[in-house]
Swiss-Prot record:
<dbReference type="InterPro" id="IPR008193">
    <property type="entry name" value="RNA_pol_Rpb11_13-16kDa_CS"/>
</dbReference>
<dbReference type="GO" id="GO:0005737">
    <property type="term" value="C:cytoplasm"/>
</dbReference>
<comment type="function">
    <text>DNA-dependent RNA polymerase (RNAP) catalyzes the transcription of DNA into RNA using the four ribonucleoside triphosphates as substrates.</text>
</comment>
<dbReference type="GO" id="GO:0046983">
    <property type="term" value="F:protein dimerization activity"/>
</dbReference>
<keyword id="KW-0548">Nucleotidyltransferase</keyword>
<dbReference type="GO" id="GO:0000428">
    <property type="term" value="C:DNA-directed RNA polymerase complex"/>
</dbReference>
<dbReference type="Pfam" id="PF13656">
    <property type="entry name" value="RNA_pol_L_2"/>
</dbReference>
<keyword id="KW-0804">Transcription</keyword>
<comment type="subunit">
    <text>Part of the RNA polymerase complex. Forms an Rpo3-Rpo10-Rpo11-Rpo12 complex upon coexpression.</text>
</comment>
<dbReference type="InterPro" id="IPR022905">
    <property type="entry name" value="Rpo11-like"/>
</dbReference>
<dbReference type="GO" id="GO:0003899">
    <property type="term" value="F:DNA-directed RNA polymerase activity"/>
</dbReference>
<keyword id="KW-0963">Cytoplasm</keyword>
<dbReference type="InterPro" id="IPR036603">
    <property type="entry name" value="RBP11-like"/>
</dbReference>
<dbReference type="GO" id="GO:0006351">
    <property type="term" value="P:DNA-templated transcription"/>
</dbReference>
<keyword id="KW-0240">DNA-directed RNA polymerase</keyword>
<dbReference type="GO" id="GO:0003677">
    <property type="term" value="F:DNA binding"/>
</dbReference>
<keyword id="KW-0808">Transferase</keyword>
Length: 99
């Protein structure tokens, strides 16, 4: 997965996820909204049309995070991604126990 930082300020970061769909940004947004110090977390795909040959969106998802003063939006983003990894690890462990 490729990521591009579009804008970076003390309390704001906007990133673009290259060749991704709604799956990760939607989950990440929901997790970020539960984090202390996060004022706003959202994502958008500017143009929802799919490319006929690749099946990918013509536009890439953009995630925007705005935090309260003293909260680094990139650190909150990393924390949210680690939370997703933990969720997946927990699910994998539960599936192993079901064998």
């Amino acid at each position: 997965m490729e990521i591009k930082i579009l804008e970076r300020k003390d309390n704001l970061v906007e990133i673009e996820l290259i060749n991704e769909d709604h799956s990760l940004p939607n989950l990440l947004k929901d997790i970020l909204l539960t984090k202390e110090g996060v004022k706003m977390a959202s994502y958008s795909i500017d143009h929802p049309l799919l490319h006929p040959e690749t099946g990918r969106y013509i536009s890439n998802p953009k995630i925007t995070i705005i935090t309260e003063e003293g909260t680094d939006p990139l650190e909150v983003l990393k924390e949210g991604l680690r939370d997703i990894i933990k969720m997946c690890d927990t699910l994998l462990d539960e599936l192993k126990e079901k064998k």
